[in-house]
From Swiss-Prot:
Gene3D superfamilies: 1.10.10.410, GatB domain, N-terminal subdomain. The gene is gatB. It comes from Rickettsia rickettsii (strain Iowa). This is Aspartyl/glutamyl-tRNA(Asn/Gln) amidotransferase subunit B. Keywords: ATP-binding, Ligase, Nucleotide-binding, Protein biosynthesis. The keyword ATP-binding applies.
Length: 483
């Protein structure tokens, strides 16, 4: 449990999240308009999106399937009967004068997700609901000193709003939840999770209280657009509320915005209640009825999800839970790992993957899908180390060439003459030379200066251009120096 340190004692965080995830779909929720990001303004707007008189919405079946799959991934109840409602409010970039959403009967309810806590335990976060709704357009106020401009490309794009219960007890837990949810959506393929492009946005409902007291008055922070800012926004807002309460003031229930530059929240508007939106069923859309057959079909076609992969990696490949989580955090990395792990030692592969390959990818600012090293060639490199064909030091040289060229490791070793020397006779000859050339060091070592052993190893490696098998060198040197 994390606390906010006030002047009069400790306060608890109480946090609930609302995640707006843009559905991965080529067309909008109720029209056939394209959803391509960053298209020319108002180039992806149908008569339905612009709310022209007489235009009727037609539900996108693919978006419904994406919501069902997400609900299944969240271990939630898929409601076989759900209804679309009109959420009535006026805004310039909402041409209908209302948003089509699901208030009374959402498509998904009662899910859960487990997140790691600071103590290393798992904590279950309850998910109240997932409902479908359409996005609004975009108002632009910086194009002219006299006018605001409206871009309706985004109007009507399908969203899944995923709402948690107030089970989150720290800014770090909130960040963990969003990271894990984003990864789940990416594995399912229902949302790309790109917060920078606005395809995943987070609202945080925050209140504070003394331990054991009832829930306090909450404020909602809108449209937080990064994991880092989720932590910053919650920390600032909770401290602001504590300062007000400790000075005898009341918390006003309101909607606030987070300024990433100043790290502060500011008032946007007073918080509305459901009655303010005058929800009622949309008369242009029939209730959505979902069959058991459809649910079972979508469930059968779900990919292997992150938690399932972590369990598989720890059991089948004997990886640590930490290593498994690192690999599973990126679906492309997990796919790469599995292709390579079938051909070599998974543990050794993991070490090279998370250190050498990740390091080079970060340095080059590219993803694993852009890497020139194929999973098969990466596995070959690991096997060459495993069977002592090359040393770890030589392997790093080979790896760097592989990363630059994409060549197979055995071809590089052949071209560069980098095969590891593991012949006892050859190594004994080199060791004899090193001992003969350094009599004083030999005497020092035999008189108890054990640190000199590293000097002898270094000399052998130098004479063999780093190609000597280090394990064998250690063994043979100890035998020679102790005789």
């Amino acid at each position: 449990m994390a606390y906010i340190e006030g002047n009069t004692g400790k306060w608890e965080y109480v946090i609930g999240l609302e995640i707006h995830a843009q559905i991965s779909s080529k067309s909008k929720l109720f029209s056939g308009s394209s959803t391509i990001f960053a298209a020319n303004p108002n180039s992806q707007v149908s008569y339905v999106d612009a709310a022209m008189p007489g235009m009727l919405p037609v539900l996108n079946k693919h978006c419904v399937h994406q919501a069902i799959k997400t609900g299944l991934g969240l271990k939630a109840k898929i409601n076989k009967y759900s209804v679309f409602d009109r959420k009535n409010y006026f805004y310039a970039d909402l041409p209908q004068g209302y948003q089509i959403s699901q208030f009374y009967y959402p498509i998904v309810q009662n899910g859960t997700m487990e997140i790691p806590t600071s103590t290393g335990d798992l904590k279950t976060i309850r998910i109240n609901r997932l409902h479908l709704e359409q996005d609004a357009g975009k108002s632009m106020h910086d194009q002219s000193p006299h006018y605001s401009f409206i871009d309706l490309n985004r109007a009507g794009i399908g969203l899944m709003e995923i709402v948690t219960e107030p089970d989150i007890s720290s800014p770090e837990e909130a960040a963990e939840f969003v990271k894990k949810l984003r990864n789940l959506l990416r594995y399912i393929g229902s949302c790309d999770g790109d917060m920078e492009k606005g395809s995943m946005r987070c609202d945080a409902n925050i209140s504070v209280r003394r331990s054991g007291e009832p829930l306090g008055t909450r404020c909602e922070i809108k449209n937080i657009n990064s994991i880092r800012n989720i932590i910053k926004a919650i920390e600032f807002e909770a401290k602001r509320q504590v300062d007000l309460l400790e000075s005898g003031e009341e918390i006003i229930q309101e909607t606030r915005l987070f300024n990433a530059d100043s790290g502060e929240t500011r008032t946007m508007r007073l918080k509305e209640e459901a009655l303010d939106y005058r929800y009622f069923p949309d008369p242009d859309l029939l209730p959505l009825v979902i069959s058991d057959e459809l649910i079972n079909e979508l469930k059968a076609n779900l990919p292997e999800l992150p938690d399932q992969k972590i369990e598989k990696y720890t059991k089948e490949f004997s990886l640590s839970k930490y290593d498994a989580e690192v690999i599973v955090a990126d679906e492309s990395v997990a796919e790469y790992f599995e292709k390579a792990a079938n051909e070599c030692n998974p543990k050794m592969l993991t070490n090279w993957l998370t250190s050498e390959l990740f390091g080079q990818l970060n340095k080059a600012s590219i993803g694993i899908n852009e890497c020139k090293i194929t999973p098969s060639n990466f596995a070959k490199l690991v096997k060459l180390i495993e069977n002592d064909t090359i040393s770890g030091k030589i392997a790093k040289t080979v790896f760097e060439i592989m990363f630059e060229t994409g060549k197979a490791p055995d071809k590089i070793i052949e071209e560069k003459g980098l095969v590891q020397v593991s012949d006892n006779n050859v190594l004994n000859t080199v060791i004899d030379e090193v001992i003969a050339e350094n009599p004083e060091s030999v005497e020092g070592y035999r008189s108890g200066k054990d640190k000199l052993f590293g000097f002898f190893v270094g000399q052998v490696m130098k004479k063999t251009d780093g190609k000597a098998n280090p394990t064998l060198v250690n063994q043979l040197l100890k035998e020679k120096l102790s005789s």
